[in-house]
Regions:
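S-adenosyl-L-methionine
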Residues: 1-19, 24
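Short loop/edge segments at beta-strand edges and connector loops
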Residues: 6-10, 105, 132, 210-212
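Glycine-rich phosphate-binding loop signature in dinucleotide/nucleotide-binding domains
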Residues: 16-20, 71-72, 145-147
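Mobile active-site "lid"/loop adjacent to the S-adenosyl-L-methionine
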Residues: 29-61
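Short "lid" loop at the C-terminus of a central beta-strand within the Rossmann-like core
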Residues: 31-32, 82-86
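Long, positively charged amphipathic alpha-helical accessory segments at protein N-termini or as interdomain linkers
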Residues: 59-74, 79-83, 184-210, 219-354
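A SAM-dependent methyltransferase catalytic signature shared across enzymes that methylate proteins
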Residues: 67-71, 78, 89-104
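N-terminal lobe of the biotin/lipoate ligase/transferase fold
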Residues: 95-196
Length: 354
């Protein structure tokens, strides 16, 4: 009889609060659009159970309650959202506040899409290793032996690196970060799909575009950051490096962008929280949440690329126009060209113009 206690009430009501040390919160959110002024309303109990609130909805109200509650660091929140047409209770509010999320189930009923989404704090609230300066966050991450969601960020990186051994030039105030993810993740999904999915969720968090396979660009096509995967044979974990510029400018005669161009003045810690939540949403391992599926990774990756392409990005190869039409299961780009449908796995053969 002491295992379950039931109390009536909810967020926003006097005297109601989230119980201390809560580890699981489940809510079938009311998702009917709130009635406009002059429209008929339901009975009081039906209105409370079925209709959402305006301006952020019940979801934002719960998010605010959690900000002052003393729940466990590993508390998991599971909610049912109406995502199409969009409900006031939007998953985006949780992402912007640094919560990771993963789709658990979805269903299309008539003209509505319902999704069950889980939310948690990356690393169960364990902070990253923060360095004022280092040679490379990839090298610093190599020194970490502790299990769990481990990441390193540095506000100044002296000797960063990019794809194929190229250098990644950073200025003081930029963001250089490395995450450690289990190597079996990359083995299961392939490096190509892994880095494209990461590029897609990071670009979404920063309100940018992703260029296949892993560059973060502004709407105007200027590069803001990039993603790099490294992992030795037999290593239990793979390093995911992400570099982001704070300010735009010019590098070797090429225009670059910074997060302040799209987000406005923002602290590096704030940007890291958004990116950390995005990466954890894909690959953090939780005992109570199923791993992300290959199909979901493909959907996320192609959605990110499609948003960029839908804005008029022109892609060519060897001077001839081509049209990206999809991704293979390994994250390779499928192109429609003059000779038919082809697959490419090397970005160097393509030219992207926003």
């Amino acid at each position: 009889s002491n295992l379950i206690n039931v109390s009536e009430g909810g967020p926003g009501e006097d005297g109601w609060s989230i119980p201390e040390d809560s580890s699981l919160i489940v809510w079938n959110l009311p998702y009917l659009s709130p009635p406009r002024e002059g429209e008929p309303v339901l009975e009081a109990i039906e209105e409370a159970s079925l209709s959402d609130l305006a301006d952020g909805g019940w979801s934002d109200l719960l998010l605010g309650e959690l900000g002052s509650a003393t729940v466990r660091d590993d508390c998991l929140v599971v909610m049912l959202h109406r995502t199409d047409p969009p409900s006031p209770s939007s998953p985006e509010s949780w992402k912007s506040e640094g919560w990771s999320s993963r789709l658990l189930a979805s269903s299309r009923i008539a003209d509505e899409s319902l999704e069950v989404i889980s939310y948690w704090r990356p690393g169960s609230g364990t902070p990253p290793i923060v360095l004022e300066e280092c040679r490379s966050t990839m090298d610093e991450a190599e020194k970490i032996s502790e299990p769990g969601w481990q990441r390193v960020l540095s506000l100044s990186q002296i000797s960063g690196r990019g794809r194929r051994g190229s250098s990644w030039q950073s200025k003081t105030g930029d963001l250089a970060c490395t995450w450690l993810i289990p190597s079996n993740v990359v083995e299961e999904y392939s490096p190509g799909l892994t880095q494209t999915a990461i590029g897609a969720v990071v670009s979404d968090a920063l309100r940018c575009n992703v260029k296949w396979p892993n560059d973060i660009l502004t709407d105007g096509g200027a590069k803001l950051g990039g993603v790099l995967l490294e992992g030795g044979t037999g290593s239990p974990r793979v390093k995911v490096g992400i570099g982001l510029n704070r300010k735009g400018g010019s590098l070797d005669g090429i225009r670059i962008a910074g997060w302040e161009d799209v987000l406005g003045p923002s602290r590096a810690s704030e940007v890291f929280e958004m990116v950390d939540a995005a990466v954890a949403s894909l690959f953090e391992e939780l005992p109570s949440v199923s791993p992300i599926t290959r199909e979901e990774l493909l959907r996320i990756s192609w959605r990110g690329l499609s948003e960029s392409l839908s804005q008029g990005t022109h892609v060519s190869r060897s001077g001839s126009s081509v049209r990206p039409v999809g991704l293979t299961e390994d994250g390779h780009l499928i192109l429609y060209c003059e000779s038919g449908v082809e697959t490419v796995d090397e970005v160097e053969s393509l030219s992207w113009v926003a």
